[in-house]
A protein has these predicted regions:
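Sec-dependent bacterial lipoprotein signal peptides
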Residues: 1-21
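Bacterial Sec-dependent N-terminal signal peptides
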Residues: 18-40
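First exposed extracellular module after export/assembly in secreted or surface-exposed proteins
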Residues: 34-194
Length: 194
C-alpha cells in the first residue's frame, strides 16, 4: 500500500511539472519580434531589364526604430549586423523554376556584405559614423528569360522580409518583420531580362 502511494505521488508530481512547462522557446533563446515596415527595398523596380544590368536590393535603417515605442536596436542587441535572405529564380518551363547562382565575386557589393549560394545571404552592417545599418548589393543578370525574386529562403511570409540580428551570445536576438512593397500576391517580384 505504501508503495502504491509513492507511485501516485510521483505520478501527480510529474503531471504537475509537465503541465507547468513553458513551451515558448523564444524566451529561452532570448528572441524578440517587432514589426517595422519598409526596411528593405528593390531599387528602381521595373518589369524589364537587359542582360548585363544588375538588380539592386538595398536596406538602410537607423539604430533607433519605432515599433509603437522607440527601441535602440544597437544598444539592445549589441549586433553589428542584421541578416536577411532572398532568392532569384529563372523560369525553365511553365511549371519549373531554377535558382540562379553567381560567384560572390560577381555581386556588386556597395554597402554591407553578401554571400550567394542557393539564396543570397544579405548582411546589413552597422556604420558607426552614420548610425545606420546598411546594405546595397547588385545581382548580375547574365542571361535572357523570365525571372522572379522572393524574400526569406526559410520563410512562409509573402509580403515581409525577416531581418535577424547577429547578436553576441549573451545578448537579445531581435527579429524584425518588415513589410516590403512591389511583390505579387504570392510574394514574388517578377521581371524579364532581354
Amino acid at each position: 500500500m505504501k508503495m502504491k502511494k509513492i507511485h501516485y505521488i510521483l505520478l501527480i508530481a510529474v503531471a504537475f511539472l509537465v503541465s507547468n512547462c513553458d513551451t515558448n522557446d523564444d524566451g529561452f533563446y532570448n528572441n524578440v519580434f517587432v514589426d517595422v515596415p519598409n526596411l528593405v527595398s528593390i531599387e528602381s523596380p521595373t518589369t524589364t531589364y537587359t542582360v548585363g544590368q544588375k538588380l539592386y536590393v538595398s536596406s538602410q535603417f537607423p539604430r533607433i526604430l519605432n515599433d509603437g515605442a522607440l527601441i535602440d536596436i544597437f544598444q539592445t542587441t549589441g549586433a553589428n549586423e542584421f541578416v536577411f535572405s532572398y532568392v532569384i529564380e529563372k523560369q525553365i518551363n511553365p511549371t519549373v523554376w531554377e535558382v540562379v547562382t553567381v560567384n560572390d565575386s560577381q555581386l556588386d557589393i556597395v554597402k554591407g556584405d553578401a554571400q550567394n549560394g542557393s539564396f543570397v545571404y544579405a548582411i546589413c552592417q552597422y556604420n558607426t559614423v552614420s548610425g545606420l545599418y546598411e546594405y546595397r548589393v547588385g545581382f548580375p543578370l547574365l542571361s535572357t528569360g523570365t525571372y522572379r525574386m522572393s524574400f526569406g529562403y526559410n520563410s512562409d511570409s509573402k509580403d515581409t522580409v525577416e531581418l535577424r540580428s547577429l547578436s553576441p551570445a549573451t545578448r537579445l536576438i531581435l527579429n524584425i518583420n518588415s513589410l516590403i512593397t512591389g511583390l505579387d500576391a504570392n510574394g514574388f517580384y517578377n521581371f524579364t531580362v532581354n
